[in-house]
Amino acid sequence: MVSTEEAINHSGLDLEKIDKLRVGVIWGSGIGGIETFQNQMLDHASGDGTPRFNPFFIPKMIADITPGYISMKYGFMGPNYTTVSACASSANAMVDALNYIRLGYCDVIVTGLSLIHI
């Protein structure tokens, strides 16, 4: 989040004047939450069979949490998703961002990469 905030501040974007419907967030994630998923499955398998999961299981596991949080923080209402394609994730996110702008669907796309093993 710190790098996103710095990027937006350095961009010169006037958040009061832009059309937030035309600002999207496309993020890349090489992998996210796999350790969380593994731990939950092991806990479930070694338990009594009752399907109990940590309430943070989904938020810690899904790769799309980052662009969602960025969009909510800044009120961006354009395209919002994560590309997951191993080492090419950030490149795919940047190409998607370029195409949204090039084709006239958006004026601004915030793009980046997160690689988290939690």
Tell me what each language-model feature is:
Residues M1, G24-G28:
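Short, conserved beta-strand segments within well-ordered enzyme catalytic domains
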Residues M1-E6, L15:
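N-terminal amphipathic, basic-rich helices that act as targeting or association modules
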